[in-house]
Design a protein with these regions (language model features):
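Outer-membrane beta-barrel architecture
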Residues: 26-34, 82-87, 110-112, 127-135, ...
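Outer membrane beta-barrel transmembrane domains
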Residues: 46-57, 200, 205-340
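Cleavable N-terminal export/targeting peptides
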Residues: 1-15
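Short loop/turn motifs that connect adjacent beta-strands in outer-membrane beta-barrel proteins
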Residues: 2-6, 21-30, 44, 80, ...
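Short sequence motifs at beta-strands and strand-loop junctions characteristic
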Residues: 60-66, 106-111, 169-176, 228-232, ...
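Surface-exposed strand-loop-strand hairpins of Gram-negative outer-membrane beta-barrel proteins
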Residues: 5, 39-68, 167
Length: 340
């Protein structure tokens, strides 16, 4: 879902509403397969909303490249009920500088699998122009949250095996509960509005994965930034769409957020909270039982907010602490949905 070190992972939440119920009236007991491929390159560092231009100028910025493939299998039972299984795969790299020498760490494999049930609130037979779909699901900790690779010491040339950065871990280590709300309203047969809301609550506090290949300092231990947090995340998305023959054109806004504090449980451990507000143009081409689409959110506002360990360290030392995060300029989402 996200665009950089603010490590919001792919969840399949935006792909749940592949077809309006009014387009499937009378169809029961069929399958939808959705393949969504996402790519982004994060390299611009922010502290709050302020970009750290010197990082790119001095070429010591972190560069994340993330490729995620979501495979979603949806069983539509009738005009109102459906069940979705989402299986993500990721291929990630993180390039960073140590003592003037750039090196990269990598991760590859399956992410956190989720299962969600969905229900249209209004009867499609009588609610022709609009409807609201709600869904609840469970995200399982199937992705490796302690994926390891070799880190280079640029000064000595030594390599040390350790956990890769939180932003390229395959999972977060938590069993979470998700809420989806998807809605649309058609003013005409070709023009309408859409909206999506997704929230993932992760009650687990920390997952035990160390944040450094060296022994943590007393300060890190005191503020709990020595281990990775298991954060919540949410998405808000809305816009307008226009149908022209077999094409659907859309333009909207979206807010991807990893909050400072979780809805349930504690918010200890290291995380890079923040949000990205983006403009999102999209296009879908439909033929037969197949739909091809592309969406490219373009970042407008990027904000790396102060984390709980940052706040604690500020209180402990009397020196204001506010960590940074790397963000992308845009994200590319391309995919296909097939009805069986």
């Amino acid at each position: 879902m996200a665009q950089g070190c603010v490590a919001i992972r792919s969840t399949g939440g935006i792909c749940a509403m592949d077809e309006h119920p009014d387009s499937t009236s009378g169809s029961k007991g069929y399958w939808l397969y959705n393949n969504n491929d996402r790519y982004y390159k994060s390299f611009r560092h922010f502290v709050g909303k302020a970009e750290q231009y010197e990082r790119t100028a001095l070429h010591n910025n972190v560069i994340n490249k993330v490729v995620t493939q979501d495979n979603s299998f949806t069983r539509v039972f009738d005009e109102r009920w459906s069940l979705t299984l989402d299986v993500p795969f990721a291929d990630n790299s993180r390039s960073q500088v140590s003592s003037g020498t750039r090196f990269a760490t990598h991760s590859f494999g399956v992410g956190d699998i989720s299962v969600s049930g969905f229900y249209w609130l209004f009867n499609p037979a009588t609610s022709k122009n609009g409807n609201i779909q709600v869904g609840m699901g469970v995200k399982f900790a199937t992705g490796n949250y302690d994926y390891q690779d070799y880190f280079l010491n640029g000064a000595t040339g030594a390599r040390t095996l350790g956990a890769v950065d939180q932003s390229i871990q395959l999972g977060d280590g938590g069993t979470g509960v998700s809420l989806d709300v998807n809605a649309y309203y058609n003013f005409t047969r070709t023009f309408g509005f859409y909206g999506n809301f997704f929230y993932l609550a992760n009650p687990r506090d920390v997952n035990g994965t160390p944040t450094s290949t060296t022994a943590p300092s007393a300060t890190k231990l005191a503020v709990t930034s020595d281990v990775e947090s298991v954060p919540d995340q949410y998405l808000i998305r809305f816009g307008a769409s226009l149908a022209v023959n077999k094409f659907d054109f859309s333009l909207g806004m979206r807010d991807d957020c990893l909050p400072v504090r979780d809805l349930f449980g504690n918010s200890d451990g290291f995380r890079r909270p923040g949000y990205i507000i983006a403009a999102e143009p999209g296009i879908t081409y439909r033929f037969g039982n197949i739909a091809l689409y592309a969406y490219v959110p373009i970042a407008i506002i990027r904000d790396r907010t102060q984390s709980v360990p940052d706040i604690r360290q500020t209180a402990l030392t009397g020196v204001y602490t506010h960590g940074d995060a790397a963000f992308a300029d845009y994200v590319v989402n391309v995919g296909v949905t097939v009805k069986f």
